């Protein structure tokens, strides 16, 4: 302890050294210290899994692990050269930092994103201090296209042919025009700060690019505000899918809100009440919006599981069109001053309609143009009338971006943590988990009487169970719940010729109304060797291309088959089992009855419904106090905070108002529609299969039978079709 009035020795030494350095200080950033030099044997503060991404590490740690690591190595070498020249790169933003950011501007990996963010923060902090290195001055000139050597298309990894091939560039949402132009005012990967009420699962509410000084779109009428990209990028335990489609938005309801309700004479089970709105919404909640059939094949043939992690959305190349009629001639022209309005319902204030198997999703074929569906919703009803708790929403009450021709809109979202979807079938059955070579040490009741001469007498006897009486063995687990369905045959002659589509169906009753249990809990479609049967409303049924809406024949639909889950789940058309119904005694025999419905019991295990290329990705878990295993019955991921609804409408423009005042509501508008492109990028986390199985697996393939046609392609009229549903459970795994 130092005496009063004196400093400790260590503090005095430290202050003295600091004063000496300050006394000799020269203008500019201070010179580097010896410890700031890169040492070849130094580990430094390197990000886990990398060799060079981090400060103070050595320069000889072997080959970089990826592009971000390679950029970090070049950055470290540039710092080393500056240190050799007596400059201190750590205390100013310099050309090496700028080159590092530029090299990683298309890198969406965690390390790439983190590296760019760190040096962007460094630049912002040092700018007010004048410690940002000025870029090299060049004479202004027009942007010239960059010449590229023609190359054959190749996989996104850049390899796979003889010799090294250039890798295809990933979609850079932050670019305008060609791939070498300046970034967007609002790049997709850098959303604005989210409002406080958004929660941790949503990164942004979306943003529109600002208007330019000439009141054109932010990117100008002459330049596109984004690039077309449809691809998948496979990166070990992740895959990033990017889809771009062209959309068209008509003016719905002549800009009016309207009540909608069931028709007079409808049955009580079919009554409803709600509202239609002049807004549309974007729906990309189907797997085939994001995966091509070939990518889906790669996904399910190589992975035991997958789940979504992040989503980026962008509207770009927005064009507002005006339609005029003159002497029977229709003219369509750009309207550069009209707007569309866009917003995301990130607080889930509006009734959520995504995940209800609606039409209107992004089409599976990228060349097809689609119409944005109209937003409508239902609220509480009594018959076809509203009740006191019925809710009405005016969407103009929500803040929205107003975008003109050339503007864009971006939105980013992070999925909540959900379990991996199990994309495998079991190679064992739940009732066959034992070693057949060894008897159990537990006993079971094997007899309740024994012969005695010409009669029998009550006598309890017990046995150990082995392979010959495997049905009697003790087991740990029960199959999953059951809600029995009627069995239907694909061969019409096997079915009863009465009308039982409603009367014979399994239903539930809620608030005085009956609804089909469709598809209901996940249950197996049929037993072994009974492929022609299916549960009446216990499977997903997709329509083939060109099928009518009502009463189509079986040849025009695609019926899914959940046969692979019969290893753990009951068969939907069979009873769950039998249950004792009395107390046996001397003069009363034991009796049982079939169990056709069975709720959840302790010890039950089961598989959820499979997902399909044509099926939904997610569903919103209802906002209730209680819920049990909320896995959507139509398949996919149950989410408390799913991707918000993104809504869009054409802003009304009054048409030729009268020159005299009228208090009446304006009801005449110029005829407009809007169009543009939409891109959706989703990052998926993969669970790679690593089976030690010896014999070959069953995998999905397109050559399942001899065919003169190519599946998943267009016909002579240019119509794309999907001839069969593709699930995910081809690989196998033990229970």
From Swiss-Prot:
Residues 52-97 are annotated as: Phospholipase A2-like. The N-terminus of VP1 is sequestered within the mature capsid. It contains a phospholipase A2-like region and putative nuclear localization signals. One of its GO terms (cellular component) is host cell nucleolus. Signal peptide: none annotated. The ratio at which VP1, VP2 and VP3 proteins are synthesized in vivo is about 1:1:10, which is the same as in the mature virus particle. Capsid protein self-assembles to form an icosahedral capsid with a T=1 symmetry, about 22 nm in diameter, and consisting of 60 copies of three size variants of the capsid protein VP1, VP2 and VP3 which differ in their N-terminus. The capsid encapsulates the genomic ssDNA. Binds to host cell heparan sulfate and uses host ITGA5-ITGB1 as coreceptor on the cell surface to provide virion attachment to target cell. This attachment induces virion internalization predominantly through clathrin-dependent endocytosis. Belongs to the parvoviridae capsid protein family. GO terms for molecular function: structural molecule activity. One of its GO terms (biological process) is clathrin-dependent endocytosis of virus by host cell. It comes from Adeno-associated virus 2 (isolate Srivastava/1982) (AAV-2). Keywords: Capsid protein, Clathrin-mediated endocytosis of virus by host, Host nucleus, Host-virus interaction, T=1 icosahedral capsid protein, Viral attachment to host cell, Viral penetration into host cytoplasm, Viral penetration via permeabilization of host membrane, Virion, Virus endocytosis by host, Virus entry into host cell. Residues 22-44, 136-224 are annotated as: Disordered. Residues 34-43 have a biased composition (Basic and acidic residues). AAV capsids serve as viral gene transfer vectors that have been shown to affect long-term gene expression and disease correction with low toxicity in animal models, and are well tolerated in human clinical trials. InterPro entries: Capsid/spike_ssDNA_virus, Parvovirus_coat, Phospholipase_A2-like, VP1/VP2. The keyword Nucleotide-binding does not apply. This is Capsid protein VP1. Residues 184-194 have a biased composition (Pro residues). The lineage of its organism: Viruses, Monodnaviria, Shotokuvirae, Cossaviricota, Quintoviricetes. It is found in: Virion; Host nucleus, Host nucleolus.
């Amino acid at each position: 302890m130092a005496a009063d009035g004196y400093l400790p020795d260590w503090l005095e030494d430290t202050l003295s050294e600091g004063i000496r350095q300050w006394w000799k200080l020269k203008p500019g950033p201070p010179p580097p210290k010896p410890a700031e030099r890169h040492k070849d044997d130094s580990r430094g503060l390197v990000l886990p899994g990398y060799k060079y991404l981090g400060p103070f590490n050595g320069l000889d740690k072997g080959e970089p692990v990826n592009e971000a690591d390679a950029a970090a190595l070049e950055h470290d070498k540039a710092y080393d050269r500056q240190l050799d020249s007596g400059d201190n790169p750590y205390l100013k933003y310099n050309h090496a930092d700028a080159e590092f950011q530029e090299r990683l501007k298309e890198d969406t990996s965690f390390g790439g994103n983190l590296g760019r963010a760190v040096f962007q923060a460094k630049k912002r902090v040092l700018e007010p201090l004048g410690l940002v290195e000025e870029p090299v001055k060049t004479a202004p000139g027009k942007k010239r296209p960059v010449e590229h050597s023609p190359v054959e298309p190749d996989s996104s990894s850049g390899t796979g042919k003889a010799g090294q091939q250039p890798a295809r560039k990933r979609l850079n949402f932050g670019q305008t025009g060609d791939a070498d132009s300046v970034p967007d005012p609002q790049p997709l990967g850098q959303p604005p700060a989210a409002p406080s009420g958004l929660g941790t699962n949503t990164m942004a509410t979306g943003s529109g690019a600002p208007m330019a000084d000439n009141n054109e779109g932010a990117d100008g009428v002459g330049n596109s505000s984004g690039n077309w990209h449809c691809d998948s990028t496979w990166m070990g335990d992740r895959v990033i899918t990017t889809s771009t489609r062209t959309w068209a938005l008509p003016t719905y309801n002549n800009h009016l809100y309207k009540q909608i309700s069931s028709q007079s004479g409808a049955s009580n089970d079919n009554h409803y009440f709600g509202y239609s709105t002049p807004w549309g919404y974007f729906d990309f909640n189907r797997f085939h919006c994001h995966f091509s059939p070939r990518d889906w094949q790669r996904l399910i043939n190589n992975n035991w599981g997958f789940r979504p992690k992040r989503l980026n959305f962008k509207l770009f190349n927005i064009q507002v069109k005006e339609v005029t009629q003159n002497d029977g001639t229709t003219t369509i022209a750009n309207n550069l001053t009209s707007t569309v309005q866009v917003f995301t319902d990130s607080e889930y204030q509006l009734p959520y309609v995504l995940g209800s198997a609606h039409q209107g999703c992004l089409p599976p074929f990228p060349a097809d143009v689609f119409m944005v569906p109209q937003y409508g919703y239902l609220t509480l009803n009594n018959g076809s009338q509203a009740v006191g708790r019925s809710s009405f929403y005016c969407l103009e009450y929500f803040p929205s971006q107003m975008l003109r021709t050339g503007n864009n809109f971006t939105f980013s979202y992070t999925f909540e943590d959900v379990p991996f979807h199990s994309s495998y079938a079991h190679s064992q059955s739940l009732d066959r988990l034992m070693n057949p070579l060894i008897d159990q040490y537990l006993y079971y009741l094997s007899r309740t009487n024994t012969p005695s001469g010409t009669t029998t007498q009550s006598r309890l006897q017990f046995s150990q169970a082995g392979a010959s009486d495997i049905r009697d063995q003790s087991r740990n687990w029960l199959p999953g719940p059951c809600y029995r369905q009627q069995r239907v045959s694909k061969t019409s002659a096997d079915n009863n010729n009465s009308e039982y589509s409603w009367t014979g169906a399994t239903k539930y009753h809620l608030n005085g109304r009956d609804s089909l249990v469709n598809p209901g809990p996940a249950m197996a479609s049929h037993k072994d060797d009974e492929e022609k049967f299916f549960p009446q409303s216990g499977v997903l049924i997709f329509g083939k291309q060109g099928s009518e809406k009502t009463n189509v024949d079986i040849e025009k639909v695609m019926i899914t088959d959940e046969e692979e889950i019969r290893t753990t789940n009951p068969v939907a058309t069979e009873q769950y089992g039998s249950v004792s119904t009395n107390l046996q005694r001397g003069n009363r025999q034991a009796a049982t009855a079939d169990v056709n419905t069975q709720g959840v019991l302790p010890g039950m295990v089961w598989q959820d419904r499979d997902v399909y290329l044509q099926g939904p990705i997610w569903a919103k878990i209802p906002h209730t106090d209680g819920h049990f295993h909320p896995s959507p019955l139509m398949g996919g991921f149950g989410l408390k905070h799913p991707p918000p609804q993104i809504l869009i409408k054409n802003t009304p423009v009054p048409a030729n108002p009268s020159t005299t005042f009228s208090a009446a509501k304006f009801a005449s508008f110029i005829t407009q529609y809007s169009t543009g492109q939409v891109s959706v990028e989703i990052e998926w986390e993969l669970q790679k299969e690593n089976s030690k199985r010896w014999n070959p697996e069953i995998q999905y393939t397109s050559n399942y039978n001899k065919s003169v046609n190519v599946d998943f392609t267009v016909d002579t009229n240019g119509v794309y079709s999907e001839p069969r549903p593709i699930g995910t459970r081809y690989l196998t795994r033990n229970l």
